[in-house]
Each structure stands twice: as structure tokens, then as C-alpha cells.
């Protein structure tokens, strides 16, 4: 089997996808925008061969690299990146080289535009926040008057919470509108008073779920990015209603042999026009592995290896590795801009036995993950909550 992996070096832990394939005898052929010496020994060791291209947006260069791999290795079975940014590139390569596994360009359009994602949720019978694609400030103001403030404005196609703004009144909406890139289509949504819960997992070729877990995000990514808030997320087993909704979404897309990451809101209070407290609303779909250190959180929470489960799904179309939910795993990220009561040494003294990883975050991911972060294990909700309170306690104001 031959697999081309786009940008295997970023994020830094993604080499694990390549390593599990190579360990099973797969030729893993990398194409990336970092020189060979810069991608790190673990990544280098996970690859059969690597082609450095200074700019992966140079499609002619990428095309030539793929063609050369095919000339020397034969048929390519999969094109993968597990990275939202490169999904369109993955799809274009599949089309140009007639690689039948994985979505083509028409399908990735539905997977990368928020408006089309919401239509897919609605087709599956899952409600969403009301939304529009405003073509003018007047359109945006009319929508806000119809649904009520606050409203959220963000690119219809985009990764994470970048360029996302909230407006609590017409003056703020005008400011957010003027700050947007006029060459980019934005989507406007009513604000949802809730928190994010995800349904994440891996499928086989019949879109059966081989593995699933859930992330709970009490502080929205938008607030973490725009307001410099602390970053917290928990890994736990999916609730039954979340799992059922997630499986309905799997039927709406080409989700054969993929790692998926589906986002939902759960209402924290009743809201007219949306539902009662506890209602699930569709937010976004991501047809790739969840970002940050979520795959590693899954491994710790389930005593498993999701990279292996993913590799086995591609090669054997089965899951061999066991893994049941055992414990809560929490990502707690602190921002350098915030003064905290406890030092890192004090945190280690109290919670060291619970820390499974502690790390500095890559600069490109600081807004979403914090500057310095911990992954901690907890056997109960009470212990989990105490960890978060202790690590994020602020210094007393003078």
C-alpha cells in the first residue's frame, strides 16, 4: 500500500499517523513545506520518502511530486493530511490522479463552508442557529433585527475562530462589518447561549463508527481567541444523544475510512427560536482529526491508540485495538497575558501525579491552546473541576 501524507510535520504530533502506517508495511510518502532537516527525527523516521516543496500552494510543484511518487512506487491508495487547511489540496490531487478513496472537490466544498455544513445538519434533522450570508451591511443589520442581538460574524470558509467577531448591538455590528475582509464571504449567525460538545471518531468503509469520544469546551474558542480567555477542554465518553446526532451527520457526507470531528452546541439555557436548555444544535463538521492534542487526550482517556485505529481502518478496514473509557483527560492552557496565583512549580507539587503531559504550545496555536498547557487525568468530575480551578486561579487584584 502507498499513502501520500501532506505536511506530515505540522502539527508536530501528526507524524504518529505516518508512523503507524509505516510500522504496518505501508510506503508513507511525505510532501511538505519544511526542509528535511527541519521536520524532526520522529517525523523523518515515520516516512519512507519525503519531498520538500517551499510552498505547498504551488500546485504544479505538488503535482510533479505526486507524479514522481506514482512513477516510482505505483498506484497511490490514499492522499491524507488530517489538516483542515489542506483538505482542498488533498481533494484536487485525488481528482487529478483518479485516486478513488477520500472526498473530491465537490464534496470538500460541503465540508469546508459553514453555510453548507448547516444545511447538512438541517437535512439530518438537527437544528442549527439561524444564519444568513449577508451581501451588505444592511443585510447584516436586518438579520440582527430579526433574530436579536448578539450575532456572530465569521468567514463562511475558514479554520478555527480566526476573523470571528461578536456584535451586541448595531454599532458593534457596523464595526465588525468594516473590519472584515471584503473579498471574503462571511456568514452571520445568531448567538447561541451554550457550550461546545464534539463527536469525534474513526469510521470504516461502510461509515460504521470504529471509535468515538467527545470533547467538552466550556469556554468558546471565539472567546479564547478574541478575549484572551483561558483554554479548557475535557475528553469524555459521548452522551447517547450526541452519539446519535453524530451518526446522522456521518450519513450526510462521504465519510468512509476517515477521522472526523463534529461540533455541536448544547444550550445552557432556554432560548426562543432555538430550544430548551440541553438541546443539541449543529455547529460545524470537520472531516479530519480533531486539532490540538485531542488525539492524545483520547489515547489517555481510553487507554488506546487512535493513530493505530486510524491506520488499521485504512489498511484492514477494521479495528483491532481495544479501548474503553477509563478516565477524564483535561487540557488546561494558560496565557502569558494573564497573572495566575500558582506557579508551574506549585502546580507540579500538587498535581504532578495526575499530569500526563506538560508542554509549551507552538506560537501558531497559542490563541487556541494557551502558551503553556497541561494534560491531566482525573477519576471523577469533582477532581477534574478542582484541577481546573487550581491551575487557572488568578492573582488577587491589588
Per-region residue spans from a language model:
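Conserved ATP-binding module of the ATP-grasp superfamily
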Residues: 127-129, 146, 150-153, 162-198, ...
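ATP-dependent carboxylate/phosphate-activation module, predominantly the ATP-grasp catalytic core
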Residues: 190-255, 259, 266, 270, ...
